Design a protein with these regions (language model features):
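Short, well-ordered beta-strand micro-motif
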Residues: 59, 80-82
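Short conserved beta-strand and strand-loop elements enriched in small hydrophobics
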Residues: 44-49
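Short beta-strand-centered aromatic/proline hotspots
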Residues: 55-66
Length: 110
């Protein structure tokens, strides 16, 4: 198992965004996390959920603290991941969610 977080790609971002993370059209992508991560490190993974399915994972390249949410003014961390990531051939049902959740990668196939 490989430690990381799960992030849901909003439906408003569309299938095109979900595909771009894994098809080679991007070299990196930015996710946001409220506050400062207590357990997350460079080299861990962001597991992506789209339309209530775990579709893949991307390795974390950098954690950039000190950003501010423009809507709330609260601190957040930018999570830069390497793309393309590893896409599952057969997505796994996984309920989408708001925010960030830590995971041991238990849903990732061995």
């Amino acid at each position: 198992m490989d430690f990381g977080i799960t992030k849901t790609i909003p439906a408003s971002a569309g299938q095109q965004t979900a595909d771009a993370l894994y098809d080679g059209s991007l070299s990196e992508y930015e996710f946001h996390m409220a506050g400062s991560p207590s357990k997350l490190q460079v080299g861990h993974y962001v597991y992506t959920i789209f339309q209530n399915q775990l579709i893949g994972r991307l390795r974390i390249r950098a954690l950039l603290p000190g950003a501010v949410n423009p809507k709330s003014g609260k601190p957040r961390t930018l999570i830069i991941v390497e793309a393309p990531g590893e896409r599952l051939e057969n997505p796994i049902p996984k309920q989408g969610h708001r925010g960030t959740r830590y995971t041991d990668g238990e849903d990732w196939p061995a």
